[in-house]
């Protein structure tokens, strides 16, 4: 490829609405241009990287035995109504009517469509296992699209769906996809972690997320530096304390805490550790034809509520936060001073595991400007229902017993789920087993965000000059920058020869023959992020040298002109081999 025949749309400034590095650099490098909120054109530079991501994903899907197909972006509402997600999915599902007043959606995912394929095409256990995959455009009507391709409305995704006759088969399909994802993200050249996760709106039982590690990541990941444990903070278990609960040492006492509604302020006023205070969170669940059930969730003052964990507790699947009026009606006080002692109406109390192990703690007195100190279980309060309802913290014991938890940020780029029979049951996807009896198919689903990978890779690989692509997904692997290509026969002949040698070796090379000044050439290709650069000039050629600089190198080095192609080829192949 020669630059004069390619489109290079670099910009000096990022748009005002670009908040994070990847969005700024993708626009400045000429990879994307905004069409509407969360919807982008992918310009030639961006599309080249997308195609390289797709190629790696396809190779590993095929290697794992998955079979490619293509399903429509537009899906009939009937399929979503069958699965129950027509109501569940909410406004993120873009719905529309055709000219005949039929309801349709633009698919954010394809479980319904692929289940429809399976129930019509798979009749016998002999046809399984089977794993279908596609690379297709999706649409999710985000309320606030932002961060460029990281949270867009239209995006490109690889989604795969496995169908098995039994749990053993599903486990094997899941393992194959998990292993394929490890290979994919390794080949992409990204630092990543596979973490245990919650299944969210997709549903199902067992799942893992694949996160690219980056400081700008939206998700918090709990991991153990001395073991393989890693989990999304939403799913990471907070272990109960090993030590036995201490015996009461204080009498229960009502204390004045004027204007101190927060645990931190109460701890400071009473000169006690924050860890001795209780954070009281009030939830409500509806009862048809009756007043709601009110729940008091008790956390240690320095801990945070994990709503995902709470929603999995019996009776709390559809919980909401109580209104201020409900709090006053049940506790006799507005938020900030409430607690489990002396409520106006009965409430259901759930104590976090850590709270259940506490003694002599401080709670709200259900009276403005007052708290109660020296509270103890069994003496002042009945023993509570106990559950893990908090986020883990740095320093907590690792659930695998092999060290302590640390926290990092991650960008989710892949997710694998064991769905079981969730969609098969809802949509009647059955097969005949060995005895001729109908059984529901066991499903797994496996997604990779193709366009999101580009943003995540940039968040992990950039400097003040621009993007630093891993070789595997760079739009070009090497750029040739000839000094005076249009003026010097020596330079032009050497550049053309080097270009031909690299191309013959299978290297993705671009020759910048635009006639730009060196500073412009260098700035463009550093911004675009090409991993390797060779500079050809008359002075160097007279000495038999060509200048080489890797995108991560602080300084350039000189290579023998007749060895430059072989040297760079070896560097690229070595990088791609990892």
Swiss-Prot record:
NCBIfam families, per database record: PRK09194.1 (NF006625), proS_fam_II (TIGR00409)
Subunit-structure text: Homodimer.
GO cellular component terms, A-Z: cytosol
Catalytic reactions of this protein: tRNA(Pro) + L-proline + ATP = L-prolyl-tRNA(Pro) + AMP + diphosphate
Superkingdom, taxonomy of origin: Bacteria
Enzyme class: ligase
Purpose of the protein: Catalyzes the attachment of proline to tRNA(Pro) in a two-step reaction: proline is first activated by ATP to form Pro-AMP and then transferred to the acceptor end of tRNA(Pro). As ProRS can inadvertently accommodate and process non-cognate amino acids such as alanine and cysteine, to avoid such errors it has two additional distinct editing activities against alanine. One activity is designated as 'pretransfer' editing and involves the tRNA(Pro)-independent hydrolysis of activated Ala-AMP.
Keyword field: Aminoacyl-tRNA synthetase, ATP-binding, Cytoplasm, Ligase, Nucleotide-binding, Protein biosynthesis
GO molecular function term, any single one: aminoacyl-tRNA deacylase activity
Record-level GO BP terms: prolyl-tRNA aminoacylation
CDD domains for the chain: ProRS-INS (cd04334), ProRS_anticodon_short (cd00861), ProRS_core_prok (cd00779)
Family affiliation: Belongs to the class-II aminoacyl-tRNA synthetase family. ProS type 1 subfamily.
UniProt free text on domains: Consists of three domains: the N-terminal catalytic domain, the editing domain and the C-terminal anticodon-binding domain.
Organism of provenance: Burkholderia ambifaria (strain ATCC BAA-244 / DSM 16087 / CCUG 44356 / LMG 19182 / AMMD) (Burkholderia cepacia (strain AMMD))
Gene3D superfamilies reported for this sequence: Anticodon-binding domain, Bira Bifunctional Protein, Domain 2, YbaK/aminoacyl-tRNA synthetase-associated domain
EC number: 6.1.1.15
Signal sequence range: none
Protein name per UniProt: Proline--tRNA ligase
Localization (cell): Cytoplasm
């Amino acid at each position: 490829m020669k630059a004069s025949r390619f489109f290079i749309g670099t910009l000096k400034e990022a748009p005002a609405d670009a908040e994070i590095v990847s969005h700024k650099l993708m626009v400045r490098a000429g990879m994307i241009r905004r069409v509407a909120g969360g919807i982008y054109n992918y310009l030639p530079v961006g599309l080249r990287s997308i195609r390289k991501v797709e190629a790696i994903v396809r190779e590993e899907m095929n290697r794992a035995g998955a079979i490619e197909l293509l399903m429509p972006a537009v899906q009939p509402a009937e399929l979503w109504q069958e699965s129950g997600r027509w109501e569940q999915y909410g406004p993120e599902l873009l719905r529309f009517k055709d000219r005949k007043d039929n309801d349709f959606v633009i698919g954010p995912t394809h479980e319904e469509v692929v289940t429809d394929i399976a129930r019509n095409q798979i009749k016998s256990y002999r046809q399984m296992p089977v794993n279908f995959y596609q690379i297709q455009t999706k649409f999710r009507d985000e309320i606030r699209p932002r961060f460029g391709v990281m949270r867009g409305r239209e995006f490109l995704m690889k989604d795969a769906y496995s169908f098995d006759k039994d749990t053993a088969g599903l486990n094997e399909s899941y393992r194959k996809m998990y292993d394929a994802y490890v290979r994919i993200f390794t080949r992409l050249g990204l630092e990543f972690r596979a973490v245990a996760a919650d299944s969210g709106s997709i549903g199902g039982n067992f799942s893992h997320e694949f996160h690219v590690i980056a400081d700008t990541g939206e998700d918090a990941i709990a991991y153990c530096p001395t073991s393989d444990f890693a989990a999304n903070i939403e799913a990471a278990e907070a272990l109960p304390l090993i030590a036995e609960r201490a015996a009461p040492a204080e009498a229960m006492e009502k204390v004045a805490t004027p204007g101190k509604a927060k645990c931190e302020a109460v701890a400071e006023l009473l000169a006690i550790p924050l860890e001795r205070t209780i954070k009281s969170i009030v939830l409500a669940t509806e009862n048809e034809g009756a007043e709601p059930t009110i729940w008091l969730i008790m956390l240690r003052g320095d801990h945070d509520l994990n709503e995902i964990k709470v929603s999995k507790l019996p009776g709390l699947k559809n919980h909401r936060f109580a209104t201020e009026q409900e709090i006053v009606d049940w506790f006799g006080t507005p938020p900030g001073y409430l607690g489990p002692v002396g409520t106006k109406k009965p409430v259901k109390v759930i104590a976090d595991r850590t709270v259940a192990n506490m003694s002599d703690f401080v709670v709200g007195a259900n009276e403005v400007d007052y708290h109660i100190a020296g509270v103890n279980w069994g003496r002042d309060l009945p023993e509570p229902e106990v559950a893990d309802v908090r986020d883990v913290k740095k320093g907590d014991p690792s659930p695998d017993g092999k060290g302590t938890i640390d926290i990092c940020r991650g960008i989710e780029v892949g997710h694998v789920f064991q769905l079981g029979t969730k969609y098969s049951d809802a949509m009647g996807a059955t097969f005949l087993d060995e005895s001729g009896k109908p059984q529901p198919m066991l499903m797994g689903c496996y997604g990779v965000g193709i366009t999101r990978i580009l943003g995540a890779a940039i968040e992990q690989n950039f400097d003040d000059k621009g993007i630093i692509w891993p070789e595997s997904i760079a739009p070009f692997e090497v750029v040739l920058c000839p000094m005076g290509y249009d003026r010097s026969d020596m330079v032009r002949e050497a550049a053309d020869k080097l270009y031909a040698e690299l191309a013959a070796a299978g290297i993705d090379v671009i020759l910048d023959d635009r006639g730009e000044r060196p500073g412009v050439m260098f700035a463009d290709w550093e911004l675009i992020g090409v991993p390797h650069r060779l500079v050809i000039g008359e002075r160097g050629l007279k000495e038999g040298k060509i200048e080489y600089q890797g995108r991560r190198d602080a300084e350039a080095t000189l290579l023998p002109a007749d060895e430059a192609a072989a040297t760079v080829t070896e560097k690229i192949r070595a990088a791609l081999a990892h």
